[in-house]
Amino acid sequence: MADFFDYLNWRGDLSFEKVPFNKIDALLLAHVTYSIFDGVVPESFSKKKTFAQVARDFTKTADYEERINIGFLINKRTAELMFKCAECERYRNVQLCGFRNIYSEEKTEQFAAVTYLVDGKPVIALRGTDDTITGWKEDFNIAWQDQIPAQKDALLYFKEAAAAFKGSFVLTGHSKGGNLVINTAVKCSKTLQKRIKEIYNFDGPGFSRDFFEQEAYKNVENKIFSFYPAFSVVGMIFHHPKNFEIVKSEGFAFWQHDAMSWQIMGADFINEASFTDESKLFYKAFNEWIDKLDNSQRHNFVDTLFGILEASGAKTNSDIEKEAVKSTAKMIAAYAELDKARRKEMLKILKLFKNVIADDIPIFKPLVLLKNNLRING
């Protein structure tokens, strides 16, 4: 079995001229974008740093130890991967610019982006959901908001990048980043659509059924390349594109979402024949349930679910992991205050998530415990 590090060991000495940019490179850059680049990668599109320069400056930051520990849900070897890129021939001279990092609890907004110049050609990578509860809530807000803040941020970012660079673009993103790149390609002007060469979606949450019927979507559909692990959970939230690859992962259950667990052979992924039964059941059950709700009901569900989570006082998954007992007690108290109808609805959705996430995601651990052990009648 082989991962990103093996890929760089095999292909790291080969330039992009010798081996063109491919799907593995797209996922690798999408994953590296989880790195805490604040104050290291230039915000301007005109000022650029190579991977080698970024790695050097990254190690000099005052909060270096905090930067390499980027939360419970992001692979702890992410910084190591960035350093590996800085050392190898293939990535050493790739330039980074246009860094953005926007976070607002008030607006329920979490967005970050980096533009990589690969042989001078721009690859826009949009960060996925991070460790914050705000980031997760924004994902679920896709259910009822026409455009979540991160989708608006992504479209604006692409317009700025398109004004700064000539020629074609590659858009790539993992998790929520996958949703953002597809949405950006659909919502931008026809002129900008023509400048998009490829769109890479790696296990991103989907869209409503109507989204795929738009003329604007059909204009870029053949440029979209979607990939999901066999045990996909995030990618099964809402409806996904009809064309996709299923990737073999060494991760267990939900942790197959971790891009570093995806298995690589040469410049390609090792594929699986189908999704797991658990993933297929979750996709069917969750989307049949959410499709039956009107917009107001969806909004109410998200606010209720995250109202319980926010009652813990935690800001991140890591916070909940550290204070699991306190968090659980506060969430149970918040749940107990709900009326009977809302409790019943919460138990229904918790059962769906319990079947696919078990104890994997800290923000859901207390809720799963609540589902298993509460002596509150639904």
Cite the ranges covered by each PLM segment.
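Gly/Ala-rich beta-loop-alpha elbow adjacent to hydrolase catalytic centers
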Residues: 172-177, 181
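Alpha/beta hydrolase fold serine-hydrolase catalytic domain that processes acyl esters and thioesters
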Residues: 1-113, 118-122, 126-141, 145, ...
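Short glycine-enriched nucleophile-adjacent loop
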Residues: 181-190
